[in-house]
Amino acid sequence: MNDYQQYIAKSRYARYIDDLQRRETWEETVKRYVDFFSTKYSNFPSIELYNGIVTLNVMPSMRALMTAGVALDRDNVAGFNCSYVSIDDPRAFDEVLYILMCGTGVGFTVERQEVVKLPAVPEELFETETTICVRDSKIGWATSFRELISLLYSGRIPKLDTSKLRPAGARLK
């Protein structure tokens, strides 16, 4: 690999290994990818594919290369490069947030025939005693956002409790 390829591999695809206090090598990144899919498919061509990827003769889904392991096992959305949604229901907003937090791009439409399906926005909003507790996870953020949008559409402004969030600058889990 040339310097540019090494930089991209290390900065975009290599996972940090806590025990070793370093990022994966290119070979370790490819091994993580191949091992992940080998456990999913019994006839997966592990050795042949590993050799092809390591030598840059074969390129897998780079999103899957980036997320193979716990993240991709937890949610297959992390393996997609892009997605699409019509903004025609309030649920679309938290779905977009969740998909983006999984690292997948989201295209969307706000064409008139779609957005007219959204509820009317109230003319006035009123503060309430309702508190939304934001949990420190992708689903926690998306759920909280869904609650917020729902309350705003009903004319209510809730309080937000962000005390469960990790400190600014802390590593993502």
Model-derived features: positions:
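Extended catalytic cores of very large enzyme megasubunits
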Residues: 1-173
